[in-house]
A protein has these predicted regions:
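Auxiliary Fe-S-binding modules of radical SAM enzymes
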Residues: 2-26, 177-252
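Conserved alpha-helical substructure of the radical SAM core
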Residues: 7, 47-81
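Canonical Radical SAM [4Fe-4S] cluster-binding loop centered on the CxxxCxxC motif
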Residues: 16-18, 22-59
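Short glycine-enriched, charge-decorated loop/helix-capping segments at active-site entrances
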Residues: 48-54, 145-151, 219-227
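Conserved AdoMet/S-adenosylmethionine-binding subsite of the radical SAM
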Residues: 69-73, 77-80, 85, 89-210, ...
Length: 252
């Protein structure tokens, strides 16, 4: 039974929303950007979502469900709701009741995650979701830590778990010149993931500087100042490289 009433309210910290999004999962989607992230990516376009509280609003799950139900007629057969951030798994426990209700209402769920948080709540969250968008920042462990200040070990273990339980996922890779746009690292990633059956597609995300102004507003240094955005030739070369290992590759 699809009803927006919850027996127990777990407030969720929401940073912002995007209606009719087309870049975060299949079809038209309501994208819910959640507050809080455990990574410190040098290129982060949403630095205002990192702090657990920030300028977010404590939101009742009913509010998000009602918004999803209002937009459901536009989702069609492929669309739905994507939870992004920030890092959604920071609030896994709070999200589980909402995920259950969304599924009862026949709404497709994506989770856009760095895969570095893994516990029983996250397992349940991923099990309920229809599709995981797994952000692999870098395959090389040293360069991953330089780029995010965190290890990529759990991200890779999470991918192994998704494969083992038969959960479909997409792999997303931000192509940062000099940091992740490195041929040997992409080939290592390809050799590692090339045989994964649950990996449905690879998305190359071009590096951009659209969030740089937020750093200035927050009084923070943007540490990739001077790094130029990808040229069309660089994106074509990267796609050709990924194509050697994966059957379905897109530049998003």
């Amino acid at each position: 039974m699809c009803t927006p009433v919850f027996r127990r309210i777990n407030m969720i910290r929401v940073h912002s929303y995007e209606s009719m999004g087309t870049f975060d999962g299949p079809g038209l989607r309501l994208v819910v950007f959640l507050q809080g992230c455990n990574f410190r990516c040098l290129y982060c376009a949403n630095p205002d979502t990192i702090d657990l509280k920030g300028e977010s609003k404590e939101t009742a799950p009913e509010e998000i469900l009602k918004m999803a139900l209002n937009q459901k007629p536009f989702f069609g057969k492929k669309g739905g709701v994507t939870f992004s951030g920030g890092e959604p798994t920071v609030q896994a426990k709070e999200l589980i009741p909402l995920f259950r209700r969304l599924k009862e209402c026949g709404i497709h769920i994506c989770v856009d995650t760095n895969g570095s948080i893994f516990n029983d709540d996250v397992k349940e969250l991923f099990s309920i979701a229809d599709l995981i968008l797994l952000d692999v920042k870098q395959f090389n462990p040293e360069r991953h830590k330089m780029l995010t200040e965190r290890s990529n070990e759990q991200t890779l273990r999470t991918a192994e778990w998704l494969e083992s339980v038969g959960k479909p996922f997409w792999l997303r890779y931000v192509l940062v010149p000099g940091y992740s746009a490195i041929e040997e690292d992409i080939r290592s990633l390809g050799n590692h993931f090339g045989g994964y059956k649950m990996l449905q597609r690879v998305e190359i995300l071009p590096y951009h500087t659209l969030g740089v102004h937020k750093y200035a507003a927050m009084g923070k240094e943007y540490k990739l100042a001077g790094v130029k955005e990808n040229t069309p030739e660089q994106l074509d070369a990267a796609k050709a490289l990924f194509d050697e290992y994966f059957p379905t590759v897109y530049v998003n």
